[in-house]
């Protein structure tokens, strides 16, 4: 759903809606399998067009494209790129953002820590990201900014020493130089967004600010940093980390950090009753990391790299502990935005809505919104819609009225 385009917020109740303030809204296609370009293109034809038909059948439809390294290289072939450009024009779709976090396989096998490889110490990560920007510059409609999101440097468990972190900064700066050159060459406004995530090199607003301060000290008074590197603010990740958007977002902006994109996403939160722990087992899969951040009533925080480890290691609370005195668990599991809350589960949608409140107060904060619920294949059956297209349409039907309530969309 793009700026000035329309979408059906709810086919039964809501009229078409138009996004305001130059906003662009899409779902991220990393929910679909597709490691080759042909597989990715097939998913656009079979799934994305089905979503478009339900949500926005008669106006331009925005796509948040996920490309693996292999798919990006295959799409860069002139014939493939021309075919895709023609397809976008024919189907009245457009790409404004690319998810460049997962480099390789992202579905159907163990991903876990592999999603962080190659990290930003690697020339492969730099070359891949540069290629994504070269493709995006050729796909963007006139007058639309382009963003690519990427991993926040590396994963803490890889134990990067200071020299390795310096390599991360150096490679990111090389990417900034390439983005700046492309922007000047093409007249496009392009920016890269680091996506903080629990247990990564950057997992909090504080760590992110410190990292940018180091970059700024290494490249003093160079405007390219602020113009071309920022943060992809994933509302699931920041909520899992117990950050409050009223603090995190203004703090990032105060330190001159661009909000490149906002991932509209939601996490699980529970109080660990015996019932809740039993129910949580259904969310412990063999594909993705589901980091768990636990905050005790005294404010102490404990982080587990994965849900199964938290369930196995965290002691049970005494049976006579009152519900209010139980710790709170927040689980990095992207659940559908429209998921109804029912005991023992809650969601972090309150964090997401607070971000939308801030966006309504200052629409210039960010123009790129991307729903990212990539966990379709590993969702417990009771949370799945009948098809992935129906689930995605339901997410639009949840988001659009909430944008409208805040003046970010209108009939």
Task: Provide a role label for each language-model segment.
Residues 109-230, 240:
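Active-site acidic/histidine proton-transfer and metal-coordination neighborhood
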Residues 13-143, 147, 174-177, 223-228, ...:
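N-terminal pre-domain/capping segments
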Residues 304-305, 309-409:
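Flexible, acidic glycine-rich loops studded with aromatic residues
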Residues 182-315, 326, 335:
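Acidic/histidine-rich catalytic cores of soluble enzymes
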Residues 73-77, 108, 158-160, 203-207, ...:
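A short acidic (Asp/Glu
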Residues 2-4:
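Residue-identity detector for glycine
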Residues 28-32, 66-70, 100-103, 151-155, ...:
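Active-site beta-loop-alpha junctions enriched in small/polar residues
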